[in-house]
Amino acid sequence: MSYFDDVYCGLCKDILENGVQVHNRTGIDTIKIPSAHFHLDVSKEFPILTTKQLFIRQAVTEMLWIYQAQSNDVRWLQERNVHIWDKWEINEDGDWIDENTGNVLKHFDPSFAHTIGTAYGYIVKKYDLMNKLLNSLKNDKEDHRRVISLWQDSELDTAVLPSCVWSSEWDVTDGKLNIWVHQRSCDVPLGLPFNVTQYAVLLMMVAQVTGLKPGTIDWSIKDAHIYVNQVDGIKEQLNRYETKGSLPAPELWLNPDITDFYDFDPTKDVKLNGYEHMGKISFPLAQ
């Protein structure tokens, strides 16, 4: 059975039972706990939920947009039929618009049109973070300074949203690649399932091209929350878990011929084998 479902449903239950309802910038209250942490062993099980369906192609494509294409251009995703970031796209006038009121939430230089500003892939490219990581893993296995930080103070004012998953630390122990991921704010129903699966794929890809085996993921969250308009969906998912348990975790296949991280194609080189799930649950997405 899927261990990630155990971890995830336990977290959701903790938030509903012990969380505090608070106001926030979106105008939709959240139920939150201040922090959460969990540990996953990717060498034993690929972490993807079975108590609801997760769309692996979209998840991997978004991850590669950040770390492979190193882009902040929303059109790159749209061309691949991924619309995760549409709500945060800067328009041609340089405005980020409230989808409900039409008001300008933030104004940018028009040169940032069709992007999310200076966040995520923009940071990876500007600071050459991915190449530095790959070079370190190939040439200095005992390097203790392997940190990818998407939180750069000088870039925050020109980002639509500062990176939520903002940091990862990379370790090599006994031939296995391990990461510790830090998340400053977490939409647990929508963001967390995607994010964990994405970083598991990233871990496996990086391990493959650097001659290592995938190891563990430690995940730390500050402000783990469920929006109040997502509670019914989470209760449905918890009911599935409590009445049916979870299903066997699938296996992720990566094309073994790929030796360069930048050659991975999510449509050809990444496959999920044996993925059983209990069906889709739709959650509203707060802007």
Predicted regions and their residues:
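Terminal, non-catalytic protein-protein interaction segments that mediate quaternary/complex assembly
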Residues: 1-287
